[in-house]
Amino acid sequence: MEYGLIGAKLGHSYSKIIHEMLCGYKYDLCPLPTEEEARAFLTKRQFRAINVTIPYKKLVMEYCSYIDPRAKAIGAVNTVVNKNGLLYGYNTDYLGFAHLCDAHGVDFAGRTVLILGTGGTHNTTSAVARDKGAAKVLTVSRHPDPETGELSYAEAVRSGAQIVINTTPAGMYPNVGVCNLDVAAMPGLEAVVDVVYNPDKTELILRAEEAGVPVAVGGLEMLVAQAVYAAEYFLDRKFEDAPAEIRRITAALRRDTLNIALIGMPSSGKTTLGKLLAKQLGRTFVDLDDAIVKADGRSIPDIFAAEGEDGFRAKETEQTARFGKENRQLLSCGGGVVKRPENLRALHQNGVVLFIDRPVEALAVGGSRPLSSSMAALRTMEAQRRPLYRAAADAVVPNTGTLEDALRAAMEALDEIFDS
């Protein structure tokens, strides 16, 4: 192996995609489940340069002949370069986190900062916060140690902090939807930063957005940035414009991996348009109504007849949560998916949402749709749901002409979203 990543579990890593997109060299994922395997790998030194992830960022320091002062102070190495058999260790997580905060205007000067978690990434983010002038850095733990001044999550809410940084795995794929801090009860917050990058927006970030926190950002750009700075060490050269490379690759990753969810009234064209979009964009097409029927074994009219709308909505929420946390899908949603806030969080956590807007006069009446029994019912429904569709959507796609027109409008909307 020339270049690659070592760690205990690498199943969901984006590092291979990032490095090969960045520099074109072959980048291998090398899972080493045990410490014994990691030590054997490092002893052999059969690589040019590697990245290191949990749980080996401290262990690798034992094998380094040189450790960058910043990495030594943090107590973790995530980038190792083999120079004629001698290993040189660096910490580009620091650089990646600093870039993320700078790029999104997080101002640490004079601020009180809460860091959720006590693991290795705590030290990295704490170093950045202190170096950028934070007045106070507080640590939050589920099991706080009073002797070290750690806070509980309940105490953290009352801390008066302006900045929150999550370094725990709370909300990380596949265990999404977890949020341990009540950010809505912290009115003075200026920024919430989560180092988790899958999903794109954790529950913490989604709730921060809902609470109106000015800056709420996940960790994907940090991941890309640390890879760019690691590649500079790998190749012993600087990129002419590293921030531009980081923006380019972050946008490309989102374009490649994020789900696209279509919302709108029944018979507005979500399924037909969705299948065309899925084919054009290389996404797996999923009709959530079909997923409900497949999981339940009954038709939608039969579910409504037996359990009413509430019973159907509960099943809809289950399937939205199931598919919403995955990647590279085109989700055609039922017309009422916007009625539950938890559904919108599930769609936004790893995707962009398009409202397919078709005039109510052009919608189909009756058929297998229990709530679309007449044009009068459709008009009432449309009046109730239109504000919800608009509030939930990242963009509106008019479907008033040909299918080709709608497809073109959808692609233009996606280009604008991913390029912004």
Locate predicted features.
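NTP-dependent small-molecule kinase module
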Residues: 244-256, 276, 280, 326, ...
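ATP-dependent small-molecule kinase phosphotransfer cores
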Residues: 290-348
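NAD(P)-binding Rossmann-fold cofactor-contacting core
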Residues: 131-149, 289-291, 295-296
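A glycine- and Lys/Arg-enriched "phosphate-lid" helix/loop adjacent to the NTP-binding pocket
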Residues: 349-388, 395
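Adenosine-phosphate binding glycine-rich loop
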Residues: 31, 195-258, 399
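Phosphate/diphosphate ligand-binding glycine-rich loop within oxidoreductases
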Residues: 2-104, 199-201, 205-207, 211-217, ...
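Glycine-rich adenosine-cofactor-binding loop
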Residues: 7, 89-94, 101-102, 106, ...
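Rossmann-like adenosine-cofactor binding region
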Residues: 148-216, 337-343
